[in-house]
């Protein structure tokens, strides 16, 4: 299995704060996420600025699109994002629209369906049918705060998604100790936000994640 990528989530309240965090690890991470909080605070300009400063990195605009998919996706992609996100509760026509927009670019740009507990496996089949390539298995920030840990149900769902042919990203308070839980699954990306940003040595933490990946994926 290929090595997973490491993605930093920038859910900062300002672009200045996000750029300060990126200055420490931007060259080391594989993927840079302009998080929903940062997008709300700074708008699409945050995507433009980060894409300009890090042209060789994959950029995700975590818009959690729920409607008006064509407009949002074109806006984020034109600003420099390679990937965007659509929330799993979005209607199927919205999901189809975001895929269509991404397919109009060369090379193709992709939208990840961000999954919460509010989905059905019938929906998953429909996403596959309309051309979705990526999904994000998401343990919510509020669930983390309530002490909810990764469960067998989570792991089984992630494996099922990978078996269906999706490129699967895992997020939700990921720590170094969590990586081993997913060792038998071809994970595409692990997202770490506060685990990296709040570390005493963020660069070392990124390297530790990569070291963990090398233990379990070849």
Swiss-Prot record:
InterPro entries: Aldolase_TIM, HPS/KGPDC, OMPdeCOase_dom, RibuloseP-bd_barrel. CDD domains: KGPDC_HPS (cd04726). It catalyses: 3-dehydro-L-gulonate 6-phosphate + H(+) = L-xylulose 5-phosphate + CO2. SMART domains: OMPdecase (SM00934). Binds 1 Mg(2+) ion per subunit. Substrate binds at residues 11, 194. Pathway: Cofactor degradation; L-ascorbate degradation; D-xylulose 5-phosphate from L-ascorbate: step 2/4. Its cofactor is Mg(2+). Its EC number is 4.1.1.85. Mg(2+) binds at residues 33, 62. GO terms for biological process: 'de novo' pyrimidine nucleobase biosynthetic process; L-ascorbic acid catabolic process. It holds the Pfam family OMPdecase. Keywords: Carbohydrate metabolism, Decarboxylase, Lyase, Magnesium, Metal-binding. Signal peptide: none annotated. The record marks 64, 67 as: Transition state stabilizer. NCBIfam families: PRK13306.1 (NF009832). PANTHER family: 3-KETO-L-GULONATE-6-PHOSPHATE DECARBOXYLASE SGBH-RELATED. Catalyzes the decarboxylation of 3-keto-L-gulonate-6-P into L-xylulose-5-P. Is involved in the anaerobic L-ascorbate utilization. This is Probable 3-keto-L-gulonate-6-phosphate decarboxylase. It comes from Mycoplasma pneumoniae (strain ATCC 29342 / M129 / Subtype 1). The lineage of its organism: Bacteria, Bacillati, Mycoplasmatota, Mycoplasmoidales, Mycoplasmoidaceae.
